[in-house]
């Protein structure tokens, strides 16, 4: 099982390439999958984690409209990616557009995946002023600190 953690600020070059932080490279592997993520970011999965996630999507009932829409969101946006010898990967133009990425991005390790955010969206979505309320709702889900 993969274990990504940490926060890294990077830039996308003129060709749409991003340097993957060295801490993530070995865990991510040479080939991986990038797709649309929730909250306007991108999700990056190592191949084995993607296969596990994809397997869970396959179990959703086809007759359920929300299940079809949820699966379509992740599967239609998915792109196989590779890392070059310099640790760079190309972020497909459609995914850059979805995540409103221009130049500055933030990569975050989220245990089983990496999230890539435009710097602006990261700041907008991740103010921690409501952390007490979030912690209370996590306790309702069975997670307590």
Regions found by a protein language model. Give the residues of each.
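Flexible "stalk/tail and boundary" regions
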Residues: 1-10, 14, 24-81, 85, ...
């Amino acid at each position: 099982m993969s274990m990504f953690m940490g926060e890294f600020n990077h830039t996308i070059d003129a060709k749409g390439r991003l340097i993957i932080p060295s801490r993530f490279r070995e865990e991510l592997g040479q080939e991986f999958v990038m797709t649309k993520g929730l909250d306007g970011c991108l999700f990056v999965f190592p191949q084995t984690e993607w296969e596990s996630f994809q397997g869970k999507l396959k179990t959703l009932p086809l007759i359920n409209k929300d299940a079809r829409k949820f699966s379509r969101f992740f599967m239609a946006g998915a792109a196989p990616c590779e890392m070059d010898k310099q640790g760079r990967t190309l972020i497909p133009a459609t995914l850059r557009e979805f995540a409103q990425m221009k130049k500055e991005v933030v990569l975050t390790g989220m245990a089983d995946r990496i999230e890539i955010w435009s710097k602006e969206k990261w700041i907008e979505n991740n103010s921690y002023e409501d952390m007490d309320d979030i912690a209370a709702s996590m306790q309702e889900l069975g997670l307590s600190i």
